[in-house]
């Protein structure tokens, strides 16, 4: 049930206008 990345560039994932670090997403497994 992970959110679908709208845009992935340079290891940075854009979740609906929210900038989430790819490393943080993998480590925390949850971007809040």
UniProtKB/Swiss-Prot annotation:
Its main location: other. It is found in: Fimbrium. Keywords: Fimbrium. It comes from the Bacteria. GO terms for cellular component: pilus. This is Fimbrin sef21. It comes from Salmonella enteritidis.
């Amino acid at each position: 049930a992970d959110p679908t990345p709208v845009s992935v560039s340079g290891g940075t994932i854009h979740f609906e206008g929210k900038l989430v670090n790819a490393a943080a997403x993998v480590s925390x497994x949850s971007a809040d």
